[in-house]
């Protein structure tokens, strides 16, 4: 079994999410490694979880840490393939590391998309994947047109505006590399309501 597109799961903080998503053959699984963040995962819990998993790659997710601190932290998490950051200025300081890079950007208005369109060729040149998230924008035509233009110039993971009803049409309409979904908190250990995440992944399952 496989999924119809490249899928990253972000902020995984429990074994229920991790095992379910691995079983659904997602490509990347992200863990927040920044102490103080509500989704922070300690090296011990990371190892405990990843010891159960196979067949996918791991992303260390950071919001505000300096690159030196990011690289130091990453040493204590065995098996990371990617680092996810939010600051464009940090890219040059991490390019020569052994990690692939994902730049996560929060899109509050179309001006940010215009800025990213100008930056996209540089991201492609440096093999940086662009992850777009938003709590405020809808996937209206203007927004989709800009995302399409960006995705034609660099690899884009779309992380907002997705649901089980529109995911198939969006993948046909936009030349994106894939999508990004978020894990969530367990109701209690071992019990999890997957809701939209599971609905979307089930739509993306390839039929044998």
Predicted regions and their residues:
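ATP-grasp fold ATP-binding core
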Residues: 100-102
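Conserved N-terminal beta1-alpha1 strand-loop-helix module at the mouth
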Residues: 1-97, 108-132, 137-208
